[in-house]
Amino acid sequence: MACGEFSLIARYFDRVRSSRLDVETGIGDDCALLNIPEKQTLAISTDTLVAGNHFLPDIDPADLAYKALAVNLSDLAAMGADPAWLTLALTLPEVDEPWLEAFSDSLFALLNYYDMQLIGGDTTRGPLSMTLGIHGYIPAGRALKRSGAKPGDWIYVTGTPGDSAAGLAVLQNRLQVSEETDAHYLIQRHLRPTPRILHGQALRDIASAAIDLSDGLISDLGHIVKASGCGARVDVDALPKSDAMMRHVDDGQALRWALSGGEDYELCFTVPELNRGALDVAIGQLGVPFTCIGQMSADIEGLNFVRDGMPVTFDWKGYDHFATP
């Protein structure tokens, strides 16, 4: 039997579940009605994902749903927010019920993990794409921003940037990885990145600035540099790289992916000298390595790199949707 828009929503997206107490009205009315907790600042982010641009057209729908939500959660993580609500506008070329079942099951599994609620959205026919609006909140005055870095602050990254680009290369057969465990790890880092929600929350009163690594370290740290109005010096020898990647590529390729590969969804953040001890206490037990890779400076402009103490330059840039090929 054909599945119309409203029956599609009812069957796959209006799940019976324990509702959040801050949702007065969710799916089923003209608007969602939300009650914002007292002394909290609302945090909102929106992302559009298009088949063939942001994800491979033949991607497993469960992986697609996970990644679509995870990359939005990463935006909340970068500002230290608590996740709360999601809207989803989904454009489909046709109603494929097995696809929708796998997609919605995966989406709700991650929503439930973070105690989030889908509160509304839209469905329409067309080339496969989706727009997610994610909402959360942050204690007033404690949000992490890109603009707070000061000269002398230390620059850190979580995890091992470059893994996602390596995983994409494996999926596209541009990188041959003979070890199954390494291939699986790299592919999962691309398809199912882990949003660093707990790290962002722990950094609220410790970091001076933060951003998530969506377009590559060169591009994203560059945003902190520009917004904060001071330069940055990065030691490329300090950049962390996973063994799974390093076993299969040379140092040059690994460095390129670490700096400009994108889609790692790790956090890059700056910490004043006074807070470095507190940083170890705050996120040292969260199970994800974090590495100091450089320092903000008033003596230089823009983003600068050094290797063995000597300046080096790179022509690489981060991802840009509208860049000329």
UniProtKB/Swiss-Prot annotation:
Q: Which residues bind Mg(2+) 5?
A: D215
Where along this sequence does the record place binding of Mg(2+) 1? Answer: T46, D47, D122
Does the UniProt entry include the keyword Membrane?
Answer: no
Kindly list the positions annotated as binding Mg(2+) 2.
D47, D75
Which HAMAP family is this protein grouped with? TMP_kinase
Q: Where does Mg(2+) 3 bind?
A: D30, D75, D212
This one is known as Thiamine-monophosphate kinase
EC main class here is transferase
Gene Ontology biological process terms, A to Z: thiamine biosynthetic process; thiamine diphosphate biosynthetic process
Q: Which gene encodes it?
A: thiL
Pathway where it operates: Cofactor biosynthesis; thiamine diphosphate biosynthesis; thiamine diphosphate from thiamine phosphate: step 1/1
EC number from the UniProt entry: 2.7.4.16
Q: Which SUPFAM superfamilies match?
A: PurM C-terminal domain-like, PurM N-terminal domain-like
The record's InterPro entries line, in alphabetical order, gives: PurM-like_C_dom (IPR010918), PurM-like_C_sf (IPR036676), PurM-like_N (IPR016188), PurM-like_N_sf (IPR036921), ThiL-like (IPR006283)
